């Protein structure tokens, strides 16, 4: 059956165009109920159960299916995802609305509908002859959709009666819209709100905890005092932004001070503009990563960024007044040049809430169902939730979602989503850090795995087409110990003309991952492999990462080779790119390769090749540094794990050898050579990587720190910075240069991927290279897969596809890759922090030498070289008299009593695991030397109480 709609439209040129829209209706679309004679099994994919075995409902005791409306799907997805909820009919009308309004919820509901155990059925009501409805005159789209949902619910109930005479199956309409529910009941459709239905499931009381509050401003505490100003409506915000009264930007909460945040202003003209917000009322219920509108305050009210470290440890709603006192303390007198543009949040343009991991802070009021949830991420405020499972959830990691933040509530309201497990357990904590950093880590789906090669796999004649056979070359790989995903291998040999041939051979991942299929889409979504301390979250399935793509020794492997002819001064004479087949002769660790190079007794082909590579690498590095490339430092640590328990038994800084530098130099050279080639061929569509030069203000901390040691650091160019760092030596303080390089690293901007057609600045500041990309790690970086495809097309080894030459799609890919790369780095740091806690838990209290990296108003941040560990020593503690602290930002320095601390001063600290806060167990550092009465702790700390003061009773608004 065909429905058509015809109308006339005026064109830009002033003409008239006739538009005909056709809508096809069918009568062979199945209802999804197995055994339905009327449909004859017409449905496809996951179906409903013939006799639903769902939990007993007190409002609907007979077997039933659920049919939710759009808002239930949007706001109660956590309830629908629960294993107790099965046999749900998802209408096409509802699915389309959800897709338009929330991409994350749409993805979640698609995942649920694809789970056969859940028995969710998607019914295409918009194309079914009996359930399609046309929009009536005067009816808006929302009312039409509500009517379409009711028509489908009514049709289902009538249709199911035809299955058999004694059939009692019903379809229950779930809606939170009071008017829609009333209309449904008038039309004879069984209808309930989500809350009514969930509360009727007496066998599953825990489901009530997962119910979301229904409005942003809803559930206000009765008789609560108004704390925050009202958010302006979106229409007023848009007018204000257009007129320049308000500014739009991303709200970024501080990790160190819960009363402070910054807003990064959007827009080309104000790209780097940053506005400071201080105080609860100025933060005005914004949450980290929200898009907000801010009003700039008069200059007389501008403030300087606070140097105070402040964490929210309030226990009740009445702490607001105390916080106002704390806010006043933040506003200390500073010089005018230290003041920054300051503002206040006037409205929320877009909420970017997500499910948060953390712990329940159980109320001490026995009968209370209201409790505070403390997120693991210190940038997120505490969340008030209602739960009947408090005793069960205490001491466990849970997930909570925010529902709204009323004006009269100190904290937002939310609901319980999921229990992750006991706090402190490795599996639980790993799950938390992966979820908190949005690292996709679910097992690869069957759809993805279906695109893997069938085993046993071998190289065929077809694979050899357009490939060079390099299996005769003495190629080897050099990697960290235990590496199974070997991306790269190298060779060096002397040619007959006396020149050298050097090859970098990279795993040909793009041969196995073809554009657009499920494997490619999942790899693009993950973006990068994430390396945690004891596990790896692969970007591609293990069959590829550790087997077919890994350039293991003594097996034939497909590769993409970059081969140079060089003279003995490492000058490139010719460059060739080719798809190849290689057979690595050795898989070496950095230490093994170094032993070969240094050994006087080894002169085999592999060792000769390594020595040639090492000699050239030294020349290449020297030349890079002369051009202004930076050699920075960061304290990286390596754990030695117990082979049985996998607990860390030793912690030490990573040792770098010449071979580390050797491999790095040739990877850099290959990346630069490939960048030039793909940009020559695809000037508008090359995927490149740039490193922006930091603004001068970034270097202030480095320059001041060096000046305190009578050293001058020049920062006008990368070359002058590199040279002044090289000259910043102290014969009496050899570690000073390393500390300066660590500080310089903190001043740097983040390197990012970008599309060449969308940016004019290609320069890589840190490498002092005019152009750069990533080509050498396609097993663990999706950027490299795209670069391989571009290079393959450039040399005629593969064909192109539309998305590869679409700069807007490439820009979107780059945006995701930059986000995934950043999150992977954060997840890795969190993993190191957790394993450091495990190490010191077993090690007990230790005393070590440390150097001051930063000076704060009430603390010093120190680095312990032995462990590569950074921590904060606080000088103000609860329940203790505060010492007299004098902070000087210009030097910078901190005076405590008669002792003055400067950056890079040597101190001695005690390191211990502080378990007083289960939610945020942390490495606690206390000053041992220099001795300051009332501040420094004695060397003997065997009687120290690390569990902190006893808990006070919590009060929560009822």
From Swiss-Prot:
Residues 227-319 form the CSD1 domain. Its cofactor is Mg(2+); Mn(2+). Residues 949-958 have a biased composition (Basic residues). The gene is DIS3. This is Exosome complex exonuclease RRP44. Transmembrane segments: none annotated. One of its GO terms (biological process) is nuclear-transcribed mRNA catabolic process, deadenylation-dependent decay. Residues 64-182 form the PINc domain. Residues 372-438 form the CSD2 domain. It is found in: Cytoplasm; Nucleus, Nucleolus; Nucleus, Nucleoplasm; Nucleus. The lineage of its organism: Eukaryota, Metazoa, Chordata, Craniata, Vertebrata. Belongs to the RNR ribonuclease family. Changing residue 146 to N: Loss of endonuclease activity.
